[in-house]
Amino acid sequence: LPITQTGGNALYKGDKLLKDEIANRDPRLYATIDTAELRLPSVASVYAASGYFANRFANPTLIGKSGGKSFTNITDAPVMKLNEVMMNYIEAAAELATLGKYTLTQTDFDRTINALRQRASTNMPTLQLVGDALRVPAGVINDSQRDADVSPILWEIRRERRVELVYEGLRFNDLRRWKKLNYADMVKNPKLNMGAYVNKREYIKWYNTVHPAAKPENTLTKEKMSKIQLVLLNAKGEYEVNDSVGYIRPIVKQDFMRTYSDK
């Protein structure tokens, strides 16, 4: 069950430490977040502002090999993967169902989301269609953070899409399609400006172990959990959504002229 649902995941340890945040969660989270510090030698000091490095399309078999020391990524980049096709299908089916143009069945989920969840690398509970909701063995999914204008079924399909296709360049267009760019509004969602929590004492202990040649100064007098925040240079640095123009994309001038000249 979602960690945002009351009594959803009793094994969730919170998000103060990375090892706790990814423990007892969807295995795809652990598989997505880089915990091995995979870096090119010449950019070893580059870090993610969010505090999370992704390892999608990073090939661990190239560690220590010439291909892993090059700025050229030789990992194949798929144009479209089967999981995207499956997620497109189940979302379209659910949208048609809300319009009364289709009737969702358990088979729809078994052929798409459940097939993905049953992969050996994922091994997540399958979703069961129960009326207007979905359930897993632990109970009916009822996320308290669900938007009122989104059905429980569609909400979970969108969640699954986000998990399956994270870091694949699809999220922005998904939010536009759903008219949910407000999720990325840093004024309405100030938490988006926050980085990762850092336990100073534990970080220094880890750093001194991994990098014995370079030790940061330890001037702490007591253990304290601190938050590192991205400080914006000015208010205009925040991404704020304007509904009147945020969903509009202009036609390229050359295409516009070509269209009319062809006629």
Predicted features, each with a name:
Residues 3-263:
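Acidic/polar-rich alpha-helix caps and helix-coil junctions
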